[in-house]
């Protein structure tokens, strides 16, 4: 048994075979979000032999991630390494034949428009509905299949959106109000629930790549109560859906710069600059020397502590501010210590 036997088992599965494995090798998959869902999916995609993986995430590895985010190590958390970078490093050890392109960035319409390659399928690993609707609209505009998943507590749901069926807006026309949706901070999260729906996502992505039909309906799981089902949420495209009926894509027109967003499961806020810019981390570190605490400059970010909060500032001008829950205070701290 040698390297040539790596994919011998999946090739024996009906529907894949040698031809399907070759399609996987030639495919490009975009994974949006590198948290619990994203890391499970990334690990499986790399082991499956997907040729190119694009991964975008805005966050850094923290100790609380290690319970459920499978690609990360204690050293990553200690260093505050960007999740996309840490994931790419680990995937290179899993399968050196897979090209992994990490992006430490907010997933925005502008970011998606600048991708170096068009993916064959997109996997949702994010923790907020605003980004999910952006992914839906972008995929719909470019006729790309994508696979949604979300998990909270012991429950999770996943659903494939092929190009020949209805989209997310057909099922849920608008994102739910923020107060109506629990978070992993308020409800917790069990890793087995994540693993189940991430496996579904990867299977659906593989099916899309090899040309097999998508599962119709949503996988719903409750790992604590032992309840598992496929629920038929997908009918025909909604007559009033802007994407499917009018070829409009609202999320692609929404400006996202300059905002502040609470991060799921933590007392932390992401703040974006009012205008996209290249941020000189080294020069800013020199300006802060002697007036802030815990100052540390890495190849990927600048970390420091000030005004009772901890900052991680990235090269695109974004900042994660820890120890702050209020969005207005986070914006004020950003303006004070990073720049308006």
Residue ranges and their predicted role:
Residues 1-340:
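Adenine nucleotide-associated cytosolic modules
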């Amino acid at each position: 048994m040698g390297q040539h036997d790596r994919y011998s088992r999946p090739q024996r599965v009906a529907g894949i075979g040698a031809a399907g494995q070759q399609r996987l090798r030639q495919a490009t998959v975009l994974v949006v979000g590198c948290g619990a869902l994203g890391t499970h999916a990334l690990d499986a995609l790399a082991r499956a032999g997907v040729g190119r993986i694009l991964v975008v995430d805005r966050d850094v590895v923290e100790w609380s991630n290690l319970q459920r985010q499978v690609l990360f190590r204690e050293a990553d958390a200690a260093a505050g390494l960007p999740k996309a970078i840490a994931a790419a490093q680990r995937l290179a050890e899993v399968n050196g034949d897979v090209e992994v392109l990490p992006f430490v960035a907010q997933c925005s319409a502008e970011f998606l428009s600048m991708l170096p390659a068009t993916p064959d399928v997109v996997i949702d690993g994010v923790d907020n509905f605003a980004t999910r609707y952006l992914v839906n609209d972008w995929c719909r505009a470019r006729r790309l299949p994508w696979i949604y998943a979300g998990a909270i507590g012991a429950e999770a749901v996943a659903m494939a959106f092929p190009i020949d069926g209805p989209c997310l807006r057909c099922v849920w026309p608008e994102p739910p109000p923020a107060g109506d949706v629990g978070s992993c901070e308020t409800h917790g999260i069990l890793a087995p629930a994540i693993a189940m729906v991430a496996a579904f996502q990867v299977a659906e992505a593989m099916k899309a790549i090899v040309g097999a039909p998508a599962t119709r309906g949503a996988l719903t799981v409750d790992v604590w109560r032992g309840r598992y089902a496929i629920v038929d949420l997908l009918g025909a495209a909604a007559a009033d859906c802007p994407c499917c009926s009018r070829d409009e894509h609202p999320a692609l027109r929404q400006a996202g710069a300059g905002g502040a967003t609470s991060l799921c499961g933590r007392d932390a806020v992401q703040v974006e600059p009012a205008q996209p810019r290249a941020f000189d981390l080294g020069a800013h570190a020199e300006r802060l020397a002697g007036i802030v605490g815990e100052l540390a400059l890495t190849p990927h970010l600048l970390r420091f502590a000030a005004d009772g909060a901890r900052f991680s500032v990235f090269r695109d001008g974004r900042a994660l501010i820890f120890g702050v829950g209020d969005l207005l205070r986070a914006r004020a701290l950003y303006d004070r210590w990073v720049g308006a």
